[in-house]
Amino acid sequence: MDEQQWTGQLDLTVFFDGNRSVSRDIFFEKALKVIRPVYLNQSTIPTFYIVNVGGGYLDGDRYRMNVNIEDNAKVTLTSQGATKIYKTPSNHVEQYQTFNLKDNAYLEYVADPIIAYENAKFYQHNTLNLNNSSSLFYTDILTPGYSKTGEAFKYQYMHLINEIYIEDELVTYDNLLLNPNKQSINEIGYMEHYSHYGSAYFIHEDVNQKLIDSVYETISSYSNTFDCRVAISQLPTHGFAVRIFAYRTQIIEKILGTIQSYIAENIYDRKLDFLRKY
């Protein structure tokens, strides 16, 4: 796509300087912006807040983001607020995100929910390129926005594709399409009467069935405490995926936060940094 057609674009490179991870080659324009990194609680890991200065995604918007994480670098990426997809009467919204992780690099990508309002059409394509020694924690939350009738699924569709490559080999292709006009997404086999959806990937060379079982034990009680469903499965590589159905965003955020904390403490021997958005 020609650069002039992007509604917003962002490029970011993070490298390890011997003491901590730092940024370079930062470029952004139009509706996308990245705030100067912060090192929460004297951490050596920078946290970047990605901002849509327009306040929401509109009819025909196109966004592009490319993040490079060099050898031994670590970074946390998050958004400053929810991604709001408003009605798109003429053309859908597109978002393309590429993440390139080198040796021993680590990416935490924990964004706020994607909210699709009435008559919204949204397409997101993520490409995640890892080496054998790099690792990743990535989350998504999908939430139905306000509609005049109060019904939950009044958006046109939400289409999310995640491609994960390790050493240039495709190991995971996740193609999620929620189209209320063509699918009974409220029924068994889709959302099963729930309205909110959450997912996470964790890839690390130490992931095995024992670790997956331990993570599941950590989060399984939420299904009894809250009205939600939680599942975890091993990816066809050294990683796992988590799926969550619920009626509230806060429940999904709590479960994903528990998983993120478990990873931080048990894999990286550190406490999770509070992102201080509010």
UniProtKB/Swiss-Prot annotation:
The keyword Secreted does not apply. GO terms for cellular component: cytoplasm. Keywords: Chaperone, Cytoplasm, Nickel insertion. Its main location: cytoplasm. It is found in: Cytoplasm. GO terms for molecular function: nickel cation binding. HAMAP family: UreD. UreD, UreF and UreG form a complex that acts as a GTP-hydrolysis-dependent molecular chaperone, activating the urease apoprotein by helping to assemble the nickel containing metallocenter of UreC. The UreE protein probably delivers the nickel. Belongs to the UreD family. This is Urease accessory protein UreD. The lineage of its organism: Bacteria, Bacillati, Bacillota, Bacilli, Bacillales. The gene is ureD.
